[in-house]
């Protein structure tokens, strides 16, 4: 189990999501979450979130990322910590609806190490950096961060044939999760 604590932090992703409670309740809720799930051997990875708007440093995102990772380690240091980090481009759904290839967009959209510069401080507290739809950055990022362990934290099932050979070839990429190949009720909120 890739056990994700929060779908939103202090900045809303959708109306009615957890962001309205995050600042007041994150510590209490995270503690209850970890204590509830840590006895389960199926939990292999803790996640502080997925596609968090604060990933580029907004709303004290860098310091919150570190605080969350440290809080998890204080409760359970036996499992690695990650976060599913995506690009900064917000028009992805419209682009994909037009039938265009997402990985082509990512290559064009994220140039000159912009993603790396803005997310490096966000990833500093993580044991494994989750890459959502960013497999084109694996090799380049490995050159910039040779000690970084990477994970395809969210990718399309139809593209696993392209992505899995990267997992097999690149020893610093430890796996790939597809979105979605299981029952899913929808975004929180």
Predicted feature residues:
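Active-site mouth of glycoside hydrolases
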Residues: 1-139, 143-149, 154-160
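Aromatic/acidic polysaccharide-binding cleft in carbohydrate-active enzymes
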Residues: 165-189
């Amino acid at each position: 189990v890739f056990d994700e604590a929060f779908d939103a932090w202090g900045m809303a992703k959708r109306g009615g999501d957890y962001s309205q409670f995050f600042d007041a309740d994150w510590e209490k809720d995270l503690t209850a979450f970890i204590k509830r799930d840590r006895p389960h051997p199926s939990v292999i990875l803790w996640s502080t979130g997925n596609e968090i708007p604060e990933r580029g440093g907004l709303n004290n995102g860098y310091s919150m990322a570190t605080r969350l990772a440290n809080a998890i380690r204080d409760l359970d240091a036996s499992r690695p910590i990650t976060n599913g980090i995506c690009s900064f481009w917000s028009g992805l759904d419209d682009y994909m609806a037009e039938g265009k290839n997402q990985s082509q967009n990512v290559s064009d959209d994220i140039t000159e190490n912009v993603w790396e510069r803005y997310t490096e401080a966000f990833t500093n507290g993580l044991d494994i950096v989750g890459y959502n739809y960013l497999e084109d950055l694996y090799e380049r990022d490995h050159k910039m961060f040779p000690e970084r362990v990477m994970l395809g934290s969210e990718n399309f099932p139809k593209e696993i044939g392209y992505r899995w050979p990267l997992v097999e070839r690149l020893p610093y990429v430890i796996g790939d999760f597809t979105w979605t190949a299981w029952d899913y009720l929808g975004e929180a909120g």
